[in-house]
Amino acid sequence: MEEKVSLKVRVQKLGTSLSNMVMPNIGAFIAWGVLTALFIADGYLPNEQLATVVGPMLTYLLPILIGYTGGYMIHGQRGAVVGAIATVGAITGSSVPMFIGAMVMGPLGGWTIKKFDEKFQEKIRPGFEMLVNNFSAGLVGFALLLLAFYAIGPVVSTLTGAVGNGVEAIVNARLLPMANIIIEPAKVLFLNNALNHGIFTPLGVEQVAQAGKSILFLLEANPGPGLGILLAYAVFGKGSAKSSSWGAMVIHFFGGIHEIYFPYVMMKPTLFLAAMAGGISGTFTFQLLDAGLKSPASPGSIIAIIATAPKGVWPHLNVLLGVLVAAVVSFLVAALILHADKSTEDSLEAAQAATQAAKAQSKGQLVSTSVDAVVSTDSVEKIIFACDAGMGSSAMGASILRDKVKKAGLEIPVSNQAISNLLDTPKTLIVTQEELTPRAKDKSPSAIHVSVDNFLASSRYDEIVASLTGASPIAEIEGDIPTSAPVDSQESDLNHIDAVVVAYGKAQGTATMGCETIRAIFRNKNIRIPVSTAKISELGEFNSKNIMIVTTISLQAEVQQAAPNSQFLIVDSLVTTPEYDKMAARMYK
């Protein structure tokens, strides 16, 4: 099973490495887009002299920046220099903008000089380090430049032409909207940046050079589908999902942080249909009205989208209509799904816990065991929020925790950055989304790692602050399993159990899911024993030998102290455990 996990992580790394070469340079793409929108012949302020800058930026500056960044990712400054030299060979060896070539030659240059250094660095005699380092970078870069000029450039040029022709054929066949069947689910799998900046941005820039705009910039950045789903929750949702959806709408639509609506979709997986329907209808409208943008819209905010639309009223209206249609369609589909739902309450926290368990099961793993880790101001000197791109939702999560840390009177810096830029430094607390934690641990094994389901709404932040201030230990940090063994339900006498209580500490989400799981098992086996949840502080009411209390390993000591006379079932996970079936098999009520 671990092979599947590593394969999934490798796929994520590939997509992330592509987007990480583009995203740090998005400012240059936007500058080029503004220059194009203003000064070309059909721009807002036509200027022949300034328009001459458009071509060199597209042909040389942008690809070299990508190649430089790709080399830097592999081997720092030396890798960046060699990657940039190699990229120039690909650029001059082709007649098309060499973005894909830069994505190949940049990392290749960094990898080559890295291997050279690993082999020869220790063999350099004292006093010759600068001479060898400078000449080795120059000669390796020179060799790769020749390779790129004669081999990589022409090959990539042919491939780029083929891909461009394929995209053009898809557009002409009116099949581009079908891409949203893949794009919308991919967002939740953390591939949105890889798709948008690793694939659509390079192809879109080439389309802008030829046609002045590109619809590809709108495929992933369209905020309409997410807006419609959040609006449906605001009207037809229940509980915390309904009350929190209004604020989420503002952050999503105007802030461009699309990750904020992912938990709402995962709460009701059928809402993937709403997201896909909205994406398909929005892209169809864009295609029908010949809409497009002049540069990437990053983040996917309606403000960024309007700012990068072509000159004129109609181009802006066409873009807005596509967003509106996507929002309306996703709202209607989501409204039908939510209206037909018969559950009494939508709990974001419970849905996030269930999502974490489902993801772990899909990877062939059990949910991470909860442990008590020693986190204090002595063991943590800085906190880093890490995600694919190092911006967006991680930046907002860092802002939320930074405010809590400041209010607690702690002087611990809280920042955000891309996982690919993490360093293996001790006394660092790294916060990542559960799906990305394996990669973060691989980059920084010496750090303390905390997994959250949602950067923008997590009770874990209060736990982190409480642990840092010494108020309480932080639970569910990735670490070793405690040596204390769980209490087997088969050791308990279950013939006289009158009630089952699922205990929880600060967060009720997983306890609620566990409670519902036990109830479902009891219904199937016709066991008429009430099942409920209770805070640890309320367990005194259930301190009886005919009460079964279910809890996790990390809370075992507190629960047994609160209700010493009760019977206990200690499990790894309140959401997914075989112990519930074993317990039910030994009950006769």
Swiss-Prot record:
Signal peptide positions on this chain:
none
* Segments on the Cytoplasmic face: 1-25, 73-135, 188-274, 339-589
Report the main location listed first in the record.
Answer: membrane
Membrane-protein topology: Multi-pass membrane protein
Question: Gene3D superfamilies this protein is in?
Answer: 3.40.50.2300
Concerning PANTHER family, the annotation shows: MANNITOL PERMEASE IIC COMPONENT (PTHR30181), PTS SYSTEM MANNITOL-SPECIFIC EIICBA COMPONENT (PTHR30181:SF2)
Q: Report the function annotation for this chain.
A: The phosphoenolpyruvate-dependent sugar phosphotransferase system (sugar PTS), a major carbohydrate active transport system, catalyzes the phosphorylation of incoming sugar substrates concomitantly with their translocation across the cell membrane. The enzyme II CmtAB PTS system is involved in D-mannitol transport.
Q: What is this protein called?
A: PTS system mannitol-specific EIICB component
Q: Which species?
A: Streptococcus pneumoniae serotype 4 (strain ATCC BAA-334 / TIGR4)
Q: What is the lineage of its organism?
A: Bacteria, Bacillati, Bacillota, Bacilli, Lactobacillales
Gene behind the chain: mtlA
